[in-house]
Amino acid sequence: MSGLEYQEGRTELNELGEFALIERLTDGFEPRRPNTIKGVGDDCAVTGAGKVKTLISMNSLAEGVDFDMMYTPLKHLGYKAVAVAISNIAAMNGTPTHIEVGVSVSNRYSVEALEELYAGIRLCCERYDVDLVGGNIGSSRSGMVLTVTAIGEADEGKITYRNGAKCHDLICVSGDLGSAYSGLLVLEREKVTYQANPNFQPDLDSYDYVLERFLKPEPRIDIVKVLDEKGVVPTSMIDVSDGLASELLHICKESECGCEVYEERIPIDYQTTRVCSEMSNNMLPVSNALNGGGDYELLFTIDQKDNEKVKDMEGVHIIGHITEKGAPAVMVTPQNSTITLVAQGFRER
């Protein structure tokens, strides 16, 4: 009997969600090496014996799940694969230094197509001063899977985990939220129209911002640098890859606390609001921010004593505060009612 046929006590993947699945699969894996400081359970593993520690993370993008070649330029895909991997380094308050790239492809991709993919990889490496130092190319029966291992470094005293938030800390987020998912919605809408009418030529100029946010996200290495210049070490941090709600719940779980964020303080770009207004299901912009994902902004908490240093930082918004252990994670609406935050499970793209 094959592994796929094994049915006794079967649990479907979508019953757990990505992070509960990782937790279940890695249960019992304890660090064996003395220089393993942090294993599974954060944005990066942390290793090393000296003052400067090594950060290691891995991220995969799968065709048909994380990207659609009908509207994803290969150069953008290469750039994005590196960007989302080194975003994990930023989420630990570190600096990315090296990457390795693994690509599995079918024979429908040409050498020239892979050269275009690697041109995007090179562009992101050049922008963020990262070296490509290895990798692997393998075969796939269908589609492409692109995996990037990111390596970085951080001073031991500045590494920021998810578990350091404490009651009364301020909750901050960089940039704006929901725009990447809004870009995906536009692309999926235009794809459906094109499939029904191949002569259709979409006009996407007015969606330039949300499209770039989805197709070519930028890791917020700049925020890490400015925080360091201001002498601020966040008490906890995570990157917003799966939506604000999911990331807040990660911090609350790991830090054993609750939180309150204020709906009117969540930063949302006007193009996101516009896209939501065009959708037939009356989508709320704040829903994109909470559950959309793909923004790769930094969500972090700071001690109240650092408020003066952070409150005027360009592109950083204070959206709420951490509450006591046992308190729920909620969003406060403009009408002063509360909505309990819920994380999404497995979701394609």
Residue ranges, per PLM feature:
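Residue-level signal for inorganic ion chemistry
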Residues: 46, 85, 93, 132, ...
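Small-aliphatic-rich amphipathic alpha-helix that forms the alpha element of a beta-alpha
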Residues: 74-98, 119-127, 226, 244-251
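Short pre-catalytic strand/loop immediately N-terminal to key active-site residues, enriched for Gly-Thr
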Residues: 72-76, 210-215, 235-236, 286-288
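Glycine-rich anion/phosphate-binding loops
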Residues: 38, 69-84, 108-119, 157
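Glycine-/charge-enriched secondary-structure boundary and capping motifs
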Residues: 2-27, 108-131, 139-146, 151, ...
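Short, acidic (Asp/Glu-rich) active-site segment that either coordinates a divalent metal cofactor
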Residues: 55-58, 145, 161-225
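Glycine-rich anion-binding loops of enzyme active sites
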Residues: 51, 97-190, 321
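Extreme N-terminal cap/leader segments of soluble proteins
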Residues: 1-73, 101
